[in-house]
Regions:
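Stable alpha-helical elements in mature extracytoplasmic
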Residues: 11-15, 19, 39-40, 47
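Catalytic cysteine-centered active-site loop
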Residues: 25-76
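Short loop/turn microsegments at loop-to-beta-strand junctions
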Residues: 39, 89-90
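Aromatic- and glycine-rich peptidoglycan recognition patches
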Residues: 2-10, 17-18, 53, 64-69, ...
Length: 128
């Protein structure tokens, strides 16, 4: 599927600033609430959805539906994907400065981490 033209719906910094408001909120597997609990792909789906940008529900689907970009060419607002035993099992929003904001796990909830807290295996862009 070709990604929709999301030009003008949001800038990378708007995506990041919105996402950062939810740092400290809980991680809940399968969750869709930015305040009461969300998982990694639910987090990205809800953040982008706030700006009218539709993302699929799973990390693997989000990786395949956006415009694929080189991990070294990421800009704030791009999505980074991480391997989970041979498949894409985690997604985070690049926030700039070598960091990502993501719904990490039940221990840390929504948090900011170094891009390379794990090795990113793919990146995708949904805003232009």
């Amino acid at each position: 599927d070709a990604p929709a033209n999301n030009s003008g719906l949001a800038t990378g910094s708007e995506i990041v600033n919105y996402a950062l408001q939810f740092v400290g909120n809980p991680y809940v597997y399968g969750g869709n609430s930015l305040t009461n609990g969300v998982d990694c792909s639910g987090f990205t789906q809800q953040v982008f959805g706030h700006f009218g940008i539709e993302l699929p529900r799973t990390a693997a689907s989000q990786a395949s539906c956006g415009t694929s970009i080189n991990v070294n060419d990421i800009q704030p607002g791009d999505l980074l994907f991480y391997d989970n035993g041979g498949y894409i099992g985690h997604v985070a929003i690049y926030s700039g400065g070598g960091q990502v904001v993501h719904a990490s796990n039940e221990d840390t909830g929504i948090t900011v981490s170094s891009v390379d807290y794990r090795t990113p295996v793919a990146a995708a862009r949904y805003i232009y």
